[in-house]
Amino acid sequence: MAPRIDDDFVFTISDHDDVSDDGGAEEIAAASAKLAGRGKKRKHTEDPDLNIRPKEAPSKKAKKDKKKGKKGKQAEPEPAAEDESDLEIAHPGEDVEGNDDIDSEFEFAVGDIDTGFVEEFDGWGNAEGTVGREQNAEKKSNAVDIDDIIERRQNKKMAEKDTMSDSEDEADKDDFSGFGEDDELLAEDGFGMGAGSDSDSEGDDEEDGDQDESKINNDSEGGAGESDDEDVAPHVPHPMDLEGAESDDAMSEQEDAVEAKKAAAFFAPEESESGKKKKGAKSIGSFHAMSLSRPIQKGLAAIGFTEPTPIQAKAIPIAMQGKDVVGGAETGSGKTAAFLIPILERLLYRPKKVPTTRVAIFMPTRELAVQCFNVATKLASFTDITFALLAGGFSSREQEVMLKTRPDVVIATPGRFIDHMHNTAAFQVEHLEILVLDEADRMLEEGFETQLNEILTTIPKSRQTMLFSATMTSTVDKLIRIGMDKPVRLMVDAKKHTVKGLTQEFIRLRQGKEDKRLAYLMYICEKIYTERVIIFFRQKKEAHRVRVVFALCGLKASELHGNMSQEQRIQAVEAFRSGKSSYLLATDVASRGLDIKNVSTVINYEAPQSHEIYLHRVGRTARAGRSGRACTLAAEPDRKVVKQAVKQSRDQGSKVVSRQVPVEETDRWMEKLRGLEDEIEDVLKEEKEERTLSITERDLKRGMNLIEHEAEIKSRPKRVWFETEKEKMAEREKGAAALNAAAGGSVKQKKKKLSGKDKKKLDARDERSEGKIWKKAKEDRGMDTNRAKEKKALAKNKSKKISKLSRR
């Protein structure tokens, strides 16, 4: 009779001893973990006894040794010692086998073993989160580097023993070697005296700030600075401000009344939500009071989140109920966690038999998508939820492999999401249950309109939709287009206000002094704000040029804009985050959502096109309760945006000051910049030549690959897109027009081929501009007509004679 088995566990094919020695289990486990993304692999895809198998062999050996008797134990003492060490490592697995009361699927250690508490979690600080960061650093070495070009040119000058260049280099080093406390000085008569970025001078700031605020509040134009010493005449308000103030207020009141009626019918009633809170009578002071699952609480503790922010306390309970949410809160208030936590909590109770993608989170920029991906994977490190990052600039082949594993959550930019939706067979969106639009007001603008419509018409209509932004739109018509069902509106300090810890400074550029803008910027960066500064530009070209100027002056800076490759963009953020560069020169690509730790100052080289963009720019500092400064160089065309910013700050009671730049410092930098103009042009020219050479090499390599692997390349299916190239260009132009229309600007129109009518109109206009010219009189015109008639008659007679001769 066969011996009775101790437990009722039924071995499958993978559990049999015949398969245990081939060594393939570990490879399969490693491969599945690699394909499954950053999270832990699923239970249904893993072999439940892969971790138990190495521990079964010693347990079976022990049973055989008992049957053999004491001789077997004495003969083999060394294997027994090895078995004890193995059992110590696999102690949890042994308990599962020995105790029938514990569930066999219970997991003692899930996720990364080295995961621990992280102080001041940074979305860019996750070493494993950023996709291929080290590989991207190697790829970036092929790109053109401004620092290398400048260093090479300086070495050439040193080799030529140019005494003038040597003296200039030494002067530059003397100017920028210190960055000490003595350098952070303002002019004695400066309007923002003592308004430095150092935290030690906060007491002086408050004393001077009271005077500054009183002065700037009297400036009815929303002044970007105090009048110069030369101006003695009292300030007179601008006529445009006086004319437009009353009409704007009247129009805004009418629009608010209409929108209020629409909102009352569209949004869920807020009273019912407040009534539920009163009945519950349980204040949410921590995440434990939200009844979150244990893995989610462990993930929050690992990041260092202990208490929810106001937007998190409001949004998480409602989002966990599956309701649509429209959330708005100030910058740096934790909106990302406000929608990630309820999503992860709901996914813990998903059906796990059939893997499918259930959540789609959309971001307007690639950097924001990478940051959200890192935060999500860190929060879900103690769960089996899987993630995929679909952003432009990364390898689409790697993303296709990741999508074959059917990740639970997809964090994407709209363009790459649509690309995979049309061209990747393994990517299915029919079972999406949750849709999230972060920075929703930007996603609803003209530039993303067609892409968003394409996504919304493809994914299921029966879904939960959540929108979040710091400047959340109140236009109901845009929200109706998304297909929301009685959404709950949650607004926490979202009245287009800045953060309380932010001090706003304005440097006014008088009319005719706009050419001194760069000199003002260089003085500020040299003397006042020397570390952890983000400088925003409107144009990519200007940001790159200033990057060259900074490099020539010895200031360590990185640039971030759309003309850079994705590898370069990530490297720029990493260099600034790690402290390798003190300045980040960026366009509005970095204005939304980017959360970099300890950014002390934000400088606007030019005021942005709208007040909403201004709020997002200055929101890169003073995040999560910290203090920070925002400095704006404002000229006459920036009057409207500056006026709105000062008015909102005055209503909010935040600190607004004006700063003056000493005239002698401005003149010194103007002379220095004039001397560097030729060097700047030479550097840009050399960079252009190197870039052209690298592009030629790339095209040559591509052509060689086309010849060598022609059959394989042609066998690949052609990638399709829902828009033509003309439609793409039209969409971009429409977005640029909408953006610049808000600032009262105009968009450059491309030259088109002139038709015949247009050419005649232009000729007529030229004739009119030339003035009076000689024209034929009536008699002359009559003579011409008579001659024409005579010629016509002669031609007819000739034709008749020819016809008669031909008949004969």
From Swiss-Prot:
<dbReference type="InterPro" id="IPR014001">
    <property type="entry name" value="Helicase_ATP-bd"/>
</dbReference>
<keyword id="KW-0067">ATP-binding</keyword>
<dbReference type="GO" id="GO:0006364">
    <property type="term" value="P:rRNA processing"/>
</dbReference>
<comment type="similarity">
    <text>Belongs to the DEAD box helicase family. DDX27/DRS1 subfamily.</text>
</comment>
<protein>
    <recommendedName>
        <fullName>ATP-dependent RNA helicase DRS1</fullName>
        <ecNumber>3.6.4.13</ecNumber>
    </recommendedName>
</protein>
<comment type="subunit">
    <text>Associates with pre-ribosomal particles.</text>
</comment>
<dbReference type="Pfam" id="PF00271">
    <property type="entry name" value="Helicase_C"/>
</dbReference>
<feature type="short sequence motif" description="Q motif">
    <location>
        <begin position="285"/>
        <end position="313"/>
    </location>
</feature>
<feature type="compositionally biased region" description="Acidic residues">
    <location>
        <begin position="243"/>
        <end position="257"/>
    </location>
</feature>
<comment type="function">
    <text>ATP-binding RNA helicase involved in ribosome assembly.</text>
</comment>
<feature type="compositionally biased region" description="Basic and acidic residues">
    <location>
        <begin position="755"/>
        <end position="793"/>
    </location>
</feature>
<dbReference type="GO" id="GO:0003724">
    <property type="term" value="F:RNA helicase activity"/>
</dbReference>
<dbReference type="InterPro" id="IPR050079">
    <property type="entry name" value="DEAD_box_RNA_helicase"/>
</dbReference>
<feature type="binding site">
    <location>
        <begin position="329"/>
        <end position="336"/>
    </location>
    <ligand>
        <name>ATP</name>
    </ligand>
</feature>
<feature type="compositionally biased region" description="Basic and acidic residues">
    <location>
        <begin position="149"/>
        <end position="164"/>
    </location>
</feature>
<feature type="compositionally biased region" description="Basic residues">
    <location>
        <begin position="794"/>
        <end position="808"/>
    </location>
</feature>
<feature type="compositionally biased region" description="Acidic residues">
    <location>
        <begin position="95"/>
        <end position="106"/>
    </location>
</feature>
<feature type="domain" description="Helicase C-terminal">
    <location>
        <begin position="517"/>
        <end position="674"/>
    </location>
</feature>
<dbReference type="InterPro" id="IPR014014">
    <property type="entry name" value="RNA_helicase_DEAD_Q_motif"/>
</dbReference>
<keyword id="KW-0378">Hydrolase</keyword>
<feature type="domain" description="Helicase ATP-binding">
    <location>
        <begin position="316"/>
        <end position="490"/>
    </location>
</feature>
<dbReference type="InterPro" id="IPR001650">
    <property type="entry name" value="Helicase_C-like"/>
</dbReference>
<keyword id="KW-0690">Ribosome biogenesis</keyword>
<keyword id="KW-0347">Helicase</keyword>
<feature type="short sequence motif" description="DEAD box">
    <location>
        <begin position="438"/>
        <end position="441"/>
    </location>
</feature>
<dbReference type="InterPro" id="IPR000629">
    <property type="entry name" value="RNA-helicase_DEAD-box_CS"/>
</dbReference>
<dbReference type="GO" id="GO:0016887">
    <property type="term" value="F:ATP hydrolysis activity"/>
</dbReference>
<dbReference type="GO" id="GO:0030687">
    <property type="term" value="C:preribosome, large subunit precursor"/>
</dbReference>
<dbReference type="GO" id="GO:0003723">
    <property type="term" value="F:RNA binding"/>
</dbReference>
<feature type="compositionally biased region" description="Basic and acidic residues">
    <location>
        <begin position="44"/>
        <end position="59"/>
    </location>
</feature>
<feature type="compositionally biased region" description="Acidic residues">
    <location>
        <begin position="199"/>
        <end position="211"/>
    </location>
</feature>
<dbReference type="GO" id="GO:0005730">
    <property type="term" value="C:nucleolus"/>
</dbReference>
<feature type="region of interest" description="Disordered">
    <location>
        <begin position="737"/>
        <end position="808"/>
    </location>
</feature>
<keyword id="KW-0547">Nucleotide-binding</keyword>
<dbReference type="GO" id="GO:0005524">
    <property type="term" value="F:ATP binding"/>
</dbReference>
<keyword id="KW-0539">Nucleus</keyword>
<dbReference type="Pfam" id="PF00270">
    <property type="entry name" value="DEAD"/>
</dbReference>
<dbReference type="InterPro" id="IPR011545">
    <property type="entry name" value="DEAD/DEAH_box_helicase_dom"/>
</dbReference>
<dbReference type="InterPro" id="IPR027417">
    <property type="entry name" value="P-loop_NTPase"/>
</dbReference>
<dbReference type="GO" id="GO:0000027">
    <property type="term" value="P:ribosomal large subunit assembly"/>
</dbReference>
<keyword id="KW-0694">RNA-binding</keyword>
<feature type="compositionally biased region" description="Basic residues">
    <location>
        <begin position="60"/>
        <end position="72"/>
    </location>
</feature>
